[in-house]
Amino acid sequence: MNPKTRSILKHLLLFTLTLLTTTLAGVEWQFSRFLFSSNPVTWEYFLKGFAFSIPLLGFLTVHEFGHYFAAKWHKVKVTLPFYIPLWLGFIGFPTIGTAGAVIRIKDLVESRRKYFDIGIAGPLAGFVVALGVLFYGFTHLPPPEYIFEIHPEYEEYGLDYADYVYEDNPLAFQVGTTLLFEFFKEYVAPQPERVPNPHEIIHFTWIFAC
């Protein structure tokens, strides 16, 4: 096997492993199901995990190829992205399934402008994808009762569950907000009551992935 083919296979293997680990992570965040637990990951739930891994890896891939194609434009030799799988679900500890991805520059970059172009291209490309993913996520929010499918124990409180279930709960945490999130919440979400509680965003993968 020639070195080029071996290198491509290595990148494909890392991507495949990262797709697997991020899909498992999606199941863990959405449904609190872990591979080795009393509430295991079935094939049905594994397929649902792609709702997390596809937007996350889509964002990550476009980000890295933004760097890659900018480098090619400037005739700077770089590698394909190295995806980094990171999954701790086997010990019951949720992660997003990856530590990201990197490309390696194999040439001396001769100017600050080239460095700047290569550096900025990734975030700009990824930001465009993030906008699309968030737009889809906010325009396809399920009814507020969806949370009872994940947390049936909330149902006794009705849609006012947030006033009760997080009190005196040391494990309760919430995802912080951003200006972009607030914009989509205010102007894109079809109905305010469909916007998930900050404690529950982890179950809404198209939003959580970005």
Predicted regions and their residues:
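Hydrophobic transmembrane alpha-helices and their immediate loop junctions
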Residues: M1-C210
